[in-house]
């Protein structure tokens, strides 16, 4: 089955290609009565869109969203919500040299073997341009989660290439082109990215994503554990090569006496679990880290083959991100929001009447 739909109760089906007429999504299962306007969605799209600094692709897209259905008199109706984003700045001539060849590190080779055809213009369906539709859907999910639970989802870049970025405060994230929670290192990062671009190469990135004010109880053991679904969602983002929940791989070097989050009447004493135990949310902040590989489209010539298997040397021309991770924060936020709203609706469907006497201690440590 084609893998274009995400979620079980809050489902999102995306469509479109990088150089097609446009892209978008159909959201089904959104609860009725949510106040929703195009401006609610546009905010996150503007954070993701290309051409916002010299450190990202210079493709100029306004990414203006249109709500085609599912909203009446400013509120969702409970029927499918159709969102459309038109492409306006395609430059397909940049990709003529790869029509009969495969770019190293890209999906060209695998799409060709799977489908027997491919849209080589900007990567077609495999392009990160598709994530604009996910960000649009995620904006709807984020608004519902915030109104229902007060949930706030924040992502920021913690490393670019070999440059680790110190955390100085979330107020800095929107003030620089790196989505960095930092002020003092921005000039250093600017110079570093300029050098990467001039070298005709690219670098990867690491991001941290947090969700605060998540209710306790979300997650469906054993196969639809909340952490498993978050990892699935994050790995579905283009170029993501690694996911950590909570302490992640650092758990290997921790002792059990340190890693296990102790409980007190006043709250948890730590959050090595990343807000999830047994696949179910604890009510603490959900903490996720993702690793993003270097952009595969670079102007440095590399070895490859053509569709007949002949050896070639290929350099990728066009407008590309020297670090695709710099625009990934809104995408990661959106995917986490889509997981949380889907599980919130699933929990409500089965367990809305469940009540226990034990206090929600994660709320008491806020």
Swiss-Prot record:
Catalytically driven reaction(s): 5-O-(1-carboxyvinyl)-3-phosphoshikimate = chorismate + phosphate
HAMAP family per the UniProt record, alphabetical: Chorismate_synth (MF_00300)
Gene3D superfamilies given in the database record: Chorismate synthase AroC
UniProt GO MF annotations: chorismate synthase activity; FMN binding
Pathway: Metabolic intermediate biosynthesis; chorismate biosynthesis; chorismate from D-erythrose 4-phosphate and phosphoenolpyruvate: step 7/7
Protein name: Chorismate synthase
Enzyme class: lyase
Cited Pfam families: Chorismate_synt
Residues annotated for FMN binding in this entry: 125-127, 238-239, 278, 293-297, 319
